Amino acid sequence: MWPLSHRHLCLAFLLVCVLSAISFFLHIYQDSIRHGLGLSILCPDRLVTAPVAIFCLPDSPMSPNTSSPCPQHPASLSGTWTIYPDGRFGNQMGQYATLLALAQLNGRRAFILPAMHATLAPVFRITLPVLAPEVDSSTPWRELQLHDWMSEEYADLGDPFLKLSGFPCSWTFFHHLREQIRSEFTLHDHLREEAQSVLRRLRLGRSGDRPRTFVGVHVRRGDYLQVMPQRWKGVVGNSAYLREAMDWFRARHEAPVFVVTSNGMEWCRENIDASKGDVMFAGDGQEASPWKDFALLTQCNHTIMTIGTFGFWAAYLAGGDTVYLANFTLPDSEFLKIFKPEAAFLPEWVGINADLSPLWTLAEP
């Protein structure tokens, strides 16, 4: 037998190494399958069984169903959009929902400003990140004031750095994302439980029975008592409207109870007929801490609203039937230039016309 050359020895050694490596990786692969271990060099497009090692490459796409340490924004989203937090509680809910919807529609990343976070985060499980003040001040924003209904131009906004403003609160912006919006506006547990505890304690006055159906009633008073007639040639809901709205529910639901909240609770007690034993004045009317009344309304089955974004959002989140005050301004009101009823109230909601006679009286010489 001829002795092996050095070259042959080297080739044999390399072959042994290759075979050993193949055997090792086959063993690892079989073990990973057996124990549910997955390895991915990209953010996965499906859920994987833990434990898992994930290496996210820059700009790698991510499925919305993926639960992983990958970046929260998909690679298709770019730029930075935000919105001025203006107005009170209901206004800022509308601004948040509109920002979220328009940013998604245009493939942009949405951020909220600290003031909006301070208003909404104590009440809801919102998820949009907060824009740091130093980033806000150094960003070359283009500003855009929105009107209160969806328009075609809002679906094709090319600005990477856009700061929105205005008081948008129209379902036409975000209704296609209703479940996502409802998820964003999920109450914190302690607020939901407190509201449900109040409802559990309510009893029908005549029988003492537990109500089967809860109808939340929001009566907007406060500054609207002057603003509506003096600036907008409009009215707020009166006792006749509330009586008709309650009768609408009494005719369609067995043993309902009406849970009244308002920023004018004294007026409600004096003007809403509670003689049937099915009206409960449950709201505290504190405008500085509106979330208690809001939580109560959202835990009801149905809603009676008058005017305003607070009532809109209570009805939108509660679901069920909604009755609203319709045609609450004169036909020549300037308010109708910034407010479109068909964009403000869902088509399935039921409108009851307002009594405009006090406005005709004011208009007389």
Curated annotation (Swiss-Prot):
Residues 1-8 are cytoplasmic. InterPro entries: Glyco_trans_11. It catalyses: a beta-D-galactosyl-(1->4)-N-acetyl-beta-D-glucosaminyl derivative + GDP-beta-L-fucose = an alpha-L-Fuc-(1->2)-beta-D-Gal-(1->4)-beta-D-GlcNAc derivative + GDP + H(+); a ganglioside GA1 + GDP-beta-L-fucose = a ganglioside Fuc-GA1 + GDP + H(+); a beta-D-Gal-(1->3)-beta-D-GlcNAc-(1->3)-beta-D-Gal-(1->4)-beta-D-Glc-(1<->1')-Cer(d18:1(4E)) + GDP-beta-L-fucose = alpha-L-fucosyl-(1->2)- beta-D-galactosyl-(1->3)-N-acetyl-beta-D-glucosaminyl-(1->3)-beta-D-galactosyl-(1->4)-beta-D-glucosyl-(1<->1')-N-acylsphing-4-enine + GDP + H(+); a neolactoside nLc4Cer(d18:1(4E)) + GDP-beta-L-fucose = a neolactoside IV(2)-alpha-Fuc-nLc4Cer(d18:1(4E)) + GDP + H(+). Glycans are attached at residues 65, 301, 327. The keyword DNA-binding does not apply. Residues 26-365 are lumenal. Its EC number is 2.4.1.69, 2.4.1.344. This is Galactoside alpha-(1,2)-fucosyltransferase 1. The gene is FUT1.
